[in-house]
Amino acid sequence: MEKWFNVGKIVNTHGIRGEVRVISRTDFPEERYKKGNTLYIFMEKSKEPVAVTVKSHRVHKSFDLLAFEGYDNINLVEKFKGAMLKVPESQLGELDEGEYYFHEIIGCTVVTEEGETIGTVKEILTPGANDVWVVKRDNGKEVLIPYIEDVVKNVDVETKTITIRPMEGLLE
């Protein structure tokens, strides 16, 4: 049984030439939405996903706009509104050392080098130079952990544990 990963949600159409507006859920949109790549559209009322090939990708405002080969007008893509774009695990590809997919990090337990449990990674923000991991503490408060060498000392995706050395004031 193939495992599937969300890479985006089609929220609307764009224009009349078959483009769809996507809220991206992928770590690497420029790679995932590259021309010629195959994506799979999962619609609520359909049992089988629809395989589509990316014809074009561009960013407009805060959305990714995608067009698919063979879908060149609004009437053909209207049915995809609300559908999820996914890829099979086999398409994920290898990452360089120190790089991780979001799904590998979200859900990890964060501990200090002294063994104090900080909380669980709930979300990943991508504001610019480095990612920021949103960690929910047991008391419900959130802590923002920058993914930089000075702070993150070890990531073990097998045991879902991240070891950090907090900078002064980071956990306050």
UniProtKB/Swiss-Prot annotation:
Q: Where in the cell is it found?
A: Cytoplasm
Return the Pfam families for the record: PRC, RimM
InterPro entries in the record, alphabetically? PRC-brl_dom, PRC_barrel-like_sf, RimM, RimM_N, RimM_N_sf, Transl_B-barrel_sf
Q: Which GO terms describe its biological process?
A: ribosomal small subunit biogenesis; rRNA processing
Which keywords has UniProt assigned to this entry? Chaperone, Cytoplasm, Ribosome biogenesis, rRNA processing
Output the Gene Ontology terms for molecular function: ribosome binding
Question: Which top-level group of life is the source organism from?
Answer: Bacteria
Q: What does this protein do?
A: An accessory protein needed during the final step in the assembly of 30S ribosomal subunit, possibly for assembly of the head region. Essential for efficient processing of 16S rRNA. May be needed both before and after RbfA during the maturation of 16S rRNA. It has affinity for free ribosomal 30S subunits but not for 70S ribosomes.
Which family would the database say this protein is a member of? Belongs to the RimM family.
Task: Reproduce the free-text note on domains from the UniProt record.
Answer: The PRC barrel domain binds ribosomal protein uS19.
Protein name according to UniProt: Ribosome maturation factor RimM
What is the originating organism of this protein?
Answer: Geobacillus sp. (strain WCH70)
Question: What gene name does this entry carry?
Answer: rimM
